[in-house]
Amino acid sequence: MADNPKAPTFIKEGSGDLESQRRNEQVNREVGELVTRKSLSDQLRENSKKKRQQFQRQTKEKNSFTRVSNDDLDHINKVKLDELEKLRNFSQWAESEERNRRKQLQLLQQPSTPEHTNKQVISKNDPIPTSIKVRKLKTSNGAKNALGVISKPKHKKTDRTQKK
């Protein structure tokens, strides 16, 4: 009787048939359960709705403290682009070094004839050769084994320097 949400029914005076009263209450409970019982599709629909709402609550909670700001995203993207650029530069450098090495190997493998020695391979990165004058070392007569000393060339005295 405590389970029944309806108001309790009391036994009238004079009727002491408890078994018939129990049967009546049982029938009333079954009829009430039939009315309140939902179909399987309704139960599944409500269950999926509850699960979806629970999942949405969990994602809101997670996103509230794990979301990255736009500045942080920009910084992360910039770092990734810098790494890709460094990788590209390194691969280009490695390819150019490989080409230079192959050219040098080809030059070494070619027969050394006068025709081939006159030809020089000049690339944009090679320095332009210039002529350099090297002065002879001046050695003193007394110290032949000593290291040579480079001295400035002496200028011939002109009329102007003699007058002073």
From Swiss-Prot:
Region feature (Disordered): 1-72, 95-164
A cellular component term, taken from the record's GO annotations: chromosome, telomeric region
Leader sequence residues: none
Compartment(s): Nucleus; Chromosome, Telomere
Main subcellular location: nucleus
Pfam families tied to this protein: FAM192A_Fyv6_N
Keywords carried by this UniProt record: Chromosome, Nucleus, Telomere
Bias kind Basic and acidic residues: ranges: 19-47, 58-72
Family affiliation: Belongs to the FYV6 family.
Primary role: Involved in telomere length regulation and promotes fully efficient non-homologous end-joining (NHEJ) by a mechanism activated in postdiauxic/stationary phase.
Protein name per UniProt: Protein FYV6
Organism lineage string: Eukaryota, Fungi, Dikarya, Ascomycota, Saccharomycotina
